[in-house]
Amino acid sequence: MAIKIYRPTSPGRRHHSVSSFEEITKSRPERALLVSVKNDSGRNNQGRVTVRHRGGGSKTQIRVIDFKRNKLDVPGRVAAIEYDPNRTARIALVFYTDGEKRYILAPSDLKVGDVIMAGENAEPKSGNALPLSSIPTGTFIHNIEIIKGKGGIMVRSAGAAAQLMAKEDDYALVRLPSGEMRKVRSDCSATVGQIGNIEHGTLEIGKAGRNRHLGWRPTVRGSAMSPNNHPHGGGECRCPIGMTGPKTPWGKPALGYRTRKAKYSDKLIVKRRG
């Protein structure tokens, strides 16, 4: 993927960059793999805001992605590399020999015409999905399962890759992109390779309207609010927040305060991120 930079014909264009989309080979998605979902604008089933600053944006259709890679020992040919408006990674349309079509996350070096497969007998090459026990140590992987058969939930964004560091007994040691070292059961599957669209992190939004198209609404400063809406609010004109350190809208310390909840799977974390 290459980055396209515009001439500074306006303040928005001056700091504006987009993907060249040169790796995209098909513009229209596969209709059988589309699902329409209503935009919830950050609300839950009670209508309350659970994620701030979300809403609006371009209307999109969900592409049904095969995160489980449970079509075992059936080879498939990559028919197209497509753009997905709902994620940062590119997706690949795969035609399997039994006639089924599926979308998968596209690794960086996957090309149209490549043949991929999932299963214990698959070769550990880019795009193939295997159990961690069948993947050589040191291999870069993505779309990693935590529970066997549930589908990959880790390392799915553009340019991301984890590394298989070691295998011992029933567990494999994986280094995640955040630096966290985590144990994962060896019978869980992962896909070999690094996810494509590697330069996505270097894109510059450039203007507020582009964020609105992506479904992000403005972030209002707490000091600009009234005191009943934010701990920093109130006062006449510009004034200090009136406390020793900044707070979240719910009164918790905003800097350095641990917010990660304890989970049963925390015992599998060998080394924390950072």
From Swiss-Prot:
Residues 1-23 are annotated as: Disordered. GO terms for molecular function: rRNA binding; structural constituent of ribosome; transferase activity. The keyword Ribonucleoprotein applies. Keywords: Ribonucleoprotein, Ribosomal protein, RNA-binding, rRNA-binding. GO terms for cellular component: large ribosomal subunit. InterPro entries: NA-bd_OB-fold (IPR012340), Rib_uL2_dom2 (IPR014722), Ribosomal_uL2 (IPR002171), Ribosomal_uL2_bac/org-type (IPR005880), Ribosomal_uL2_C (IPR022669), Ribosomal_uL2_dom3 (IPR014726), Ribosomal_uL2_RNA-bd_dom (IPR022666), Translation_prot_SH3-like_sf (IPR008991). It comes from the Bacteria. SUPFAM superfamilies: Nucleic acid-binding proteins (SSF50249), Translation proteins SH3-like domain (SSF50104). The keyword NAD does not apply. One of its GO terms (biological process) is cytoplasmic translation. Transmembrane segments: none annotated. One of the primary rRNA binding proteins. Required for association of the 30S and 50S subunits to form the 70S ribosome, for tRNA binding and peptide bond formation. It has been suggested to have peptidyltransferase activity; this is somewhat controversial. Makes several contacts with the 16S rRNA in the 70S ribosome. Belongs to the universal ribosomal protein uL2 family. Part of the 50S ribosomal subunit. Forms a bridge to the 30S subunit in the 70S ribosome. This is Large ribosomal subunit protein uL2.
